[in-house]
């Protein structure tokens, strides 16, 4: 026996090398269909039958050297080529991270925790390749039955380019602090089989291991802790997949990046970054875009967090300026578990994760909207989307003393105000008052359950839906073709309380085809919805348009911000329509248009009443929600400002609340 030092996997020496040559060399008269010759070396996967179709699966394919010892906190280094056939039949380790254990034994939480051992040696790929078994075209599918296949070549001819199959590359979420491609929910066998696409996923470093930023202290960007190492991991994985697409029967020009939450944000950065721009011309952004408040950070903030971690790890922060190499050697000697735990000391409240893509001037050259405004996205296709109740999951975790997982909570008005002020504590007082105005349930009086619902709405709108809308519109204005979906289906098998609605991440299982797994207890309509979403995503990967045969799915534009509704019942609370505008048009007009104008009034000498003059007639007429906000928010603020100007005691914020209530 010998051990491959790169993979640490044992092999029989001479016998396996000879057999490895035989299975891939026609001269021996033996062809092993499960062996693929990659640029790094040959790999052997496994075969599985899925939905009546054979899929070849390759797990644990290394694309980088293990980022351990001297490579900790550095950009990834490509994997050394190996000799002999690498065993690619086992799931790889997950990158170092902490588990969520707020609800021990609860499957709804456990499904997102790593299901393989965590390790710093974690930079591996997973790849699913459908064989040429023929899948019926979506146009002919009999929804409501399990007869998905037909014995002809139509589907294969229509859904494979001359260069090969389209490839979907998955990037997992987890707030850049957690996540792993090995989760059961990310098993892409069904997506590959039903969609007739190659699917790949990668591991990338999260937390401080992937985002520690000390560039100002280090001479030369290639040195320790340049920041964004996790993004460089993703970039190297994408390049490896593009280089090896043909080896798996794929088309290197038909690579679509798709991801959820932090994964969606990552996709949006790859489309804009000078490092990765051009590697893919299509992206799917699920509940995450780069401009979201949690999705990026300034170099100054990242540096402050890094300094705090060094101090918490007892690595003599005072020496960082004069001897950064000494400090970094200390950090490399710190136990990985210690770093993994101590980094959470910098968590700053709801969605205030201490790691995120950093504006380093190299991978991320400017703030997200500036990068977007400077981009030329002609020829880029985007599918973007949100879920109806994005905020409830995070609300529960950050305010676990207020809410229960299983049952709705009647939240008194004083607790509503307390939570809202805590969530938006970095906003100015006028901004916080405006936010409270916007999310007070005026129609329902002092309804505690409505208060809980409105706090969840505020979190979802601010951190997810409205940044997504803003980014989607920015993409269209830079030349991209954008389609928008809105996922509104509450899954019948959901383990979370009814009050939590359609949670952040609920669409993932449908896109990966999990409801089509007969062993799981989904309803037939949910299986149909999943199949429909799988086909839309696959069609988008091939053509850039998610619409199926005979279906109209309009482009998303500022003039017509139309989204397509994904719901198993074929209808939604939006009057049973398949389409809507927005989503959350009024709330997002507040966050994306009104609040920035209010924020511009940053000093007492500047009247908020001037905001009326700043708003063009065209702007106000095209967004009626702004008019409502002017009446319900700006007029009371004007009164407050005039009171200050006349040296009178300004009205208490509660008086302003009562003013709006009266006006309403």
Swiss-Prot record:
Active site: 261, 390, 504
Gene3D superfamilies in UniProt: alpha/beta hydrolase (3.40.50.1820)
InterPro entries the record matches: AB_hydrolase_fold (IPR029058), AChE-related_enzymes (IPR050654), Acylcholinesterase_insect (IPR001445), CarbesteraseB (IPR002018), Carboxylesterase_B_AS (IPR019826), Carboxylesterase_B_CS (IPR019819), Cholinesterase (IPR000997)
Positions of the propeptide removed during maturation: 648-664
Entry EC number(s): 3.1.1.7
Membrane-protein topology: Lipid-anchor; GPI-anchor
Nucleotide-binding recorded as keyword: no
Glycosylation sites: 117, 316, 517
Subcellular location: Synapse; Cell membrane
Lipid modification (GPI-anchor amidated asparagine), residues: 647
Disulfide bond entries: 95-122, 315-330, 466-588
Nuclease recorded as keyword: no
Signal peptide boundaries: 1-29
Subunit organization: Homodimer; disulfide-linked.
Similarity remark: Belongs to the type-B carboxylesterase/lipase family.
Function noted in UniProt: Rapidly hydrolyzes choline released into the synapse. It can hydrolyze butyrylthiocholine.
Listed name of the protein: Acetylcholinesterase
Species classification: Eukaryota, Metazoa, Ecdysozoa, Arthropoda, Hexapoda
């Amino acid at each position: 026996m010998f051990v491959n030092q790169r993979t640490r996997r044992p092999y029989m020496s001479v016998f396996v090398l000879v057999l490895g040559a035989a299975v891939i060399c026609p001269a021996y008269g033996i062809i092993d269909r499960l062996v693929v010759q990659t640029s790094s070396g040959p790999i052997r996967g496994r075969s599985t039958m899925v939905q009546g179709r054979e899929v070849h699966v390759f797990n644990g394919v290394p694309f980088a050297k293990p980022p351990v010892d001297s490579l900790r906190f550095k950009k990834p280094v490509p994997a050394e080529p190996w000799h002999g056939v690498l065993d690619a039949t086992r799931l790889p380790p997950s990158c170092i991270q902490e588990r969520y254990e707020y609800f021990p034994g609860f499957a709804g939480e456990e499904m997102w925790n790593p299901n393989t051992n965590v390790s710093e040696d974690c930079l591996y790929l997973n790849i699913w390749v459908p064989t040429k078994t023929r899948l019926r075209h979506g146009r002919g599918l009999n929804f409501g039955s399990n007869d998905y296949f037909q014995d002809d070549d139509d589907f294969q001819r229509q859904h494979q380019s001359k260069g090969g199959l389209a490839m979907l590359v998955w990037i997992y979420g987890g707030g850049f602090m957690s996540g792993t491609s090995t989760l059961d929910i990310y098993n892409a066998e069904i997506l590959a089989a039903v969609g007739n696409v190659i699917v790949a996923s990668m591991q990338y470093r999260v937390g401080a291991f992937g985002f520690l930023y000390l560039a100002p202290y280090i001479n030369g960007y290639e040195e320790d802790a340049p920041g964004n190492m996790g993004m460089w991991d993703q970039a190297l994985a994408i390049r490896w997949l593009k280089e090896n697409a043909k080896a798996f029967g794929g088309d290197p020009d038909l690579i679509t990046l798709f991801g959820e939450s932090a994964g969606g944000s990552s996709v949006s950065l790859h489309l804009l970054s000078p490092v990765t721009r051009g590697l893919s011309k299509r992206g799917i952004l699920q509940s995450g875009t780069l401009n979201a408040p949690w999705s990026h950070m300034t170099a100054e903030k990242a540096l402050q967090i890094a300094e705090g971690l060094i101090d918490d790890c007892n690595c003599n922060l005072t020496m960082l300026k004069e001897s950064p190499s000494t400090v970094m050697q200390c950090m490399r000697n710190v136990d990985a578990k210690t770093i993994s735990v101590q980094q959470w000391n910098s968590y700053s409240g709801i969605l205030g994760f201490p790691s995120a893509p950093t504006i380093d001037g190299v991978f991320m050259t400017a703030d997200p909207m500036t990068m977007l405004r400077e981009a030329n996205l002609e020829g880029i296709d985007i599918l973007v989307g949100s879920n109806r109740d994005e905020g409830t999951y995070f609300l529960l975790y950050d305010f676990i003393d207020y809410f229960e997982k299983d049952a709705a909570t009647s939240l008194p008005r004083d607790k509503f105000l307390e939570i809202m002020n805590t969530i938006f504590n970095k906003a100015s007082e006028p901004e916080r008052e405006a936010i409270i105005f916007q999310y007070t349930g005026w129609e329902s009086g002092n309804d505690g359950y409505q208060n809980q619902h409105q706090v969840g709405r505020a979190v979802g709108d601010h951190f997810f839906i409205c940044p997504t809308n803003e980014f989607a519109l920015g993409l269209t204005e830079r030349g991209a073709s954008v389609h928008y979906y809105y996922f509104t289906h509450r899954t019948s098998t959901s383990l979370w309380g009814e009050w939590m609605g359609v949670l952040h991440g609920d669409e993932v299982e449908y896109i990966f085809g999990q409801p089509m797994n007969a062993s799981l207890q989904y309803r037939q309509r949910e299986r149909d919805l999943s199949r429909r979403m799988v086909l839309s995503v696959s069609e988008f990967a091939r053509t850039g348009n998610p619409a199926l045969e005979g279906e109209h799915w309009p482009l998303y534009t500022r003039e017509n911000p139309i989204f397509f509704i994904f719901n198993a019942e074929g209808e939604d609370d939006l009057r049973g329509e398949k389409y809507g505008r927005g989503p959350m048009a009024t709330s997002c007009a507040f966050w994306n248009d009104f609040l920035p104008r209010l924020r511009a009034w940053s000093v007492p000498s500047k009247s908020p009443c001037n905001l009326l003059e700043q708003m063009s007639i065209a702007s106000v007429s095209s967004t009626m929600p702004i008019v409502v906000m002017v009446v319900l928010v700006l007029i009371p603020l004007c009164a407050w400002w005039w009171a200050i100007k006349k040296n009178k005691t300004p009205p208490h914020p509660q008086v302003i609340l009562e003013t709006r209530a009266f006006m309403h």
